[in-house]
């Protein structure tokens, strides 16, 4: 469990996501497709050991900005095959477009219940999203994401509800305590090379001075 969660920052339990019922695929397996790597980490943590459940990652290739991502043929096939789509939400998956609209899969939106920050604008980037979608960078928001997945999967797959609950509780127990080092920084300012650290800065009492993009 710790190995699965190590790369994701922070997690836990808090709100629920309401989604329609999902039916297992023809092979009797509930195919869950997580759109991004952080969402995949959270989903695999909750679903680990669940019977007849398979979790896959949609965007499994490096990309600096998902707003510029284009679905491949294999991506579209994965979406078509999925019984459940677990999404970051907050506009991050705008690239899915018509493929999402055509999907019959149940959808779990991890951003439900999270207070979103306005998106940071940068010259040369035409981001259509109104809000900053990098919600997993904040401990509290990551906890909500985990709980949304727990309740979403539990509603869709009651057979594995106890497993989901146990896994989510174990994940919550791994959430680290507040880092005192962040409270005593002599220079609590942050300059980053990506515009995804707003939530991290707010969560740790840092002042985000500048987000430098490669084009700059």
Which residue stretches match the model-derived regions?
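Extracytoplasmic metal-acquisition and chelation regions
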Residues: 7, 17-216
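Sec-dependent bacterial lipoprotein signal peptides
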Residues: 1-16
């Amino acid at each position: 469990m710790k190995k699965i969660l190590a790369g994701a920052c922070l997690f836990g339990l808090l709100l629920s996501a309401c989604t329609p019922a999902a039916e297992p695929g023809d092979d009797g397996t509930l195919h869950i497709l997580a759109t991004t790597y952080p969402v995949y980490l959270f989903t695999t943590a909750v679903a680990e050991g669940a019977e007849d459940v398979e979790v896959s990652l949609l965007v499994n290739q490096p990309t600096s900005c998902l707003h510029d991502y284009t679905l491949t043929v294999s991506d579209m096939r994965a979406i078509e095959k999925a019984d459940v789509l677990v999404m970051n939400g907050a506009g991050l998956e705008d690239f899915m477009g018509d493929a999402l609209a055509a999907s019959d899969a149940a959808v779990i939106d991890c951003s439900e219940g999270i207070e979103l920050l306005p998106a940071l604008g940068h010259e040369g980037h035409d981001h259509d999203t109104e809000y900053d979608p990098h919600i997993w960078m904040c401990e509290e928001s990551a906890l909500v994401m985990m709980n949304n997945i727990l309740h979403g999967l539990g509603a869709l797959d009651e057979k594995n509800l106890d497993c989901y609950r146990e896994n989510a509780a174990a994940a919550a127990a791994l959430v680290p305590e507040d880092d005192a080092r962040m409270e005593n920084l002599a220079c609590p300012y942050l300059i980053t090379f990506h515009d995804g650290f707003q939530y991290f800065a707010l969560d740790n009492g840092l002042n985000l001075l500048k987000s430098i993009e490669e084009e700059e």
